[in-house]
Design a protein with these regions (language model features):
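The catalytic core of metal-dependent phosphodiesterases that act on cyclic dinucleotides
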Residues: 2-87, 103, 107-141
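Short, conserved glycine- and acidic-residue-centered signature motifs
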Residues: 40, 92-93, 97
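Residue-level marker of structural boundaries
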Residues: 74, 93, 152-156
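A short alpha-helix in the C-terminal ATP-binding CA
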Residues: 28, 96-99
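C-terminal helical cap(s) of enzyme catalytic domains, especially alpha/beta-barrels
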Residues: 126, 142-162
Length: 162
């Protein structure tokens, strides 16, 4: 994020490889956003103009996530798996997730739940208004070739997870 040529590099890479910008998402972590908010806002504005999606990763775990939420104008909030792992038994974590879903809707962002491992978690998240998730329920880490095979299947294994 500190490289003044980052937006140009991203734009040139998208053009060179003929990648539609809506297929790319840049995830921001708290370390990147704590450096200089004015500089980060400027850099993100340049990247946003390219049509690339911006996400705050591990939302809810950093000391300043809420402070930066309104300043950074991102497209996606990714709620950390810390809140998902005991979602079915921890009322406090359910309340935090519900609040995060409401925040994401209020800011016009998509919400992604990280670390979803069970159908019960997926169902609860869906019922709370979260429409996107990632985790072992859907797929485990895999080599690129296996990922390609997964994407080209006619009947994706994870289509009914929600």
């Amino acid at each position: 994020m500190l490289d003044p040529g980052l937006a140009d590099f991203i734009g040139e890479t998208l053009q060179r490889h003929e990648i539609p910008p809506q297929f790319i998402e840049i995830e921001l972590t708290e370390n990147e956003t704590c450096i200089n908010i004015d500089y980060i806002q400027s850099a993100l504005a340049q990247i946003r103009k390219l049509g690339v999606s911006l996400a705050i990763d591990d939302f809810g775990t950093g000391m300043s996530s809420l402070a930066y939420l309104s300043a950074l104008r991102v497209n996606v909030l990714k709620i950390d798996r810390t809140f998902i792992c005991d979602l079915t038994t921890n009322k406090g974590h359910r309340a935090i997730i519900a609040a995060a879903v409401t925040l994401s809707q209020s800011f016009g962002c998509d919400m992604v739940a990280e670390g979803v491992e069970t159908q019960e978690q997926a169902r609860m998240l869906y019922d709370m208004g979260c429409r996107a998730a990632q985790g072992f329920l859907f797929a485990r880490p895999m080599p690129a070739e296996a990922f390609h095979d997964l994407l080209t299947q006619q009947q994706p294994q994870f289509s009914n997870a929600f």
